[in-house]
Amino acid sequence: MDANTTRNESFSLDCELVNPNSTLANVYFLSAVYSMYAIIFVVALIGNSFVCYIVLSSPPMRTVTNFFILNLAIGDVLITLLCVPFTSVSLLMQYWPFGGILCPVVNYSQALSVFVSAYTLVAISIDKYMIIMWPLKPRISKRFATYIIALVWLIAGITVLPSATFTTLINDENILGTSAYEQCDKYICAEEYSKVGQEYGDLYTKVLMFLQYVIPSLVLLFTYTSIGVVIWCHRIPGEAENSRDQRIAKNKTKMIKMMVTVVCVYTICWLPYNVLMIFKEHISGSVMVYLYFPLHGLAMSHACYNPIIYCYMNARFRNGFLQVMMSIPCLRRCNSINDISKILTCRWKVRRVHLYREITRAQPTSA
């Protein structure tokens, strides 16, 4: 009787455990990780929501490049909503607490949003490459840009479709640490390739990493390197030399610098995590805990940086951010924000007047 009672108490205790890992049970470690993900979630969601609002609410901001930036912001919002909360909670608890229906849906949406962001960066780089290399040819239209964006979503959706097909709730003793989780109705959400062979699953995972990071990085490296060589080493073919065209060329250069910064941040944020995923089989579990969360957090934090880059390096986005902030009642009373907004608005009006005068002077006068 006593033995049965002891076994029952032990089983009850196992079911109440959040996870068997002593590191993940440490309150300071949990607090640090949850704080990191909470900051990423708030900053990324607010920043990218501002970007979406600025582009959609302001007709002058509805350019081809900004349409791509809008799509990039939407992808980052999805990453923020789907990757950060679900992944962080399930990893810290070491089981999937959200039910069987959400398991494949969330896993597919996570992969989709990451691929959309990567492919959108590629689309922007190709657009800039064509503008610089063939400046006399007409730019792609806004309608054609929407077709490209739709194609990005379609290709990304097809690419990650197997991840949804093979994602299910499973019990893995190597991850959960004990088979008692199965009896306690605690599972992990993961891709299960036992029906087709685990070697095919490993191959698909490597192909995904190649398509999500390696190929986009190579394309971005080629396009922006070529653009840099043309801008800083040669005069752009067909580029006029009057002040109006020089100002336009300067604006192009600023936009390209901004997008190069976005690409560099993307590469820096995702490279360590992808390297970790390649060598994860050769890393012990105790070390993996300390490596995974900082590097996964770095990759997820990529969604935070783009709005900051836009605000810092683009006057229109910066003014748009300030206008949105001024529309918030509690911030409207802040004199410093109000003064900055007035200064930037005045500068923008002065620039428009100068540009109008230059265009007027460049027009031929009638005899």
Curated annotation (Swiss-Prot):
Q: Does the keyword Ribonucleoprotein apply?
A: no
Q: Where are the transmembrane segments?
A: 36-56, 67-87, 114-134, 144-164, 213-233, 259-279, 283-303
The organism's superkingdom is given as Eukaryota
Location in the cell:
Cell membrane
Protein topology in the membrane: Multi-pass membrane protein
- SUPFAM superfamilies associated with the record: Family A G protein-coupled receptor-like (SSF81321)
Q: Which residues are glycosylated?
A: N4, N8, N21, N107
Which Pfam families does UniProt cross-reference here? 7tm_1 (PF00001)
* Gene Ontology, cellular component aspect: plasma membrane
Q: Does the keyword Cell membrane apply?
A: yes
Which terms in the Gene Ontology molecular function aspect does this entry carry?
neuropeptide Y receptor activity
Q: Which keywords has UniProt assigned to this entry?
A: Cell membrane, G-protein coupled receptor, Glycoprotein, Membrane, Receptor, Transducer, Transmembrane, Transmembrane helix
List the stretches on the Cytoplasmic face of the membrane. Answer: 57-66, 135-143, 234-258, 304-367
Q: Which residues lie on this side of the membrane: Extracellular?
A: 1-35, 88-113, 165-212, 280-282
Primary localization class, coarse: membrane
Query: By its UniProt entry, which PANTHER family does this protein fall under?
Result: GH23382P (PTHR24235:SF29), NEUROPEPTIDE Y RECEPTOR (PTHR24235)
By sequence similarity, the record places it as follows: Belongs to the G-protein coupled receptor 1 family.
Q: What does this protein do?
A: Receptor for the neuropeptides RYamide-1 and RYamide-2. The activity of this receptor is mediated by G proteins which activate a phosphatidyl-inositol-calcium second messenger system. RYamide-2 is the most potent activator.
Name the record gives this protein: RYamide receptor
